[in-house]
Amino acid sequence: MEKIQKMISEKSVVIFSNNSCCMSHTIKTLFLDLGVNPTIYELDEINRGKEIEYALAQLGCSPTVPVVFIGGQLVGGANQVMSLHLNRSLIPMLKRFGALWL
């Protein structure tokens, strides 16, 4: 948990992802298309990726990828992010935490 806390405190938007996950790809594309430059951790490529995935599960993230943190706060997975986007809450949230300026 401590490692995750350190990782999410480094940037406004952090995405925990997996290269082989289509929903991870969708969420990364959404943020990039919005003009956000998220920090992306590919759990299938980094050291201790399985440990981090286990810690995300302990936080209640299911499935464990993709998982998005904005402003150091857990937003959730693809369903939660897409819901925020569709109800027009995502962009104001990104602006509030300095991840988006326009």
Curated annotation (Swiss-Prot):
It comes from the Eukaryota. Its main location: cytoplasm. One of its GO terms (biological process) is response to nitrate. CDD domains: GRX_GRXh_1_2_like. [2Fe-2S] cluster binds at residue 21. Pfam families: Glutaredoxin. Residues 1-101 form the Glutaredoxin domain. A motif (Responsive for interaction with TGA factors) lies at residues 99-102. GO terms for cellular component: cytosol; nucleus. GO terms for molecular function: 2 iron, 2 sulfur cluster binding; metal ion binding. Keywords: 2Fe-2S, Cytoplasm, Iron, Iron-sulfur, Metal-binding, Nucleus, Redox-active center. It is found in: Cytoplasm; Nucleus. InterPro entries: GlrX-like_pln_2 (IPR011905), Glutaredoxin (IPR002109), Glutaredoxin_subgr (IPR014025), Thioredoxin-like_sf (IPR036249). Belongs to the glutaredoxin family. CC-type subfamily. May only reduce GSH-thiol disulfides, but not protein disulfides. This is Monothiol glutaredoxin-S8. The gene is GRXS8.
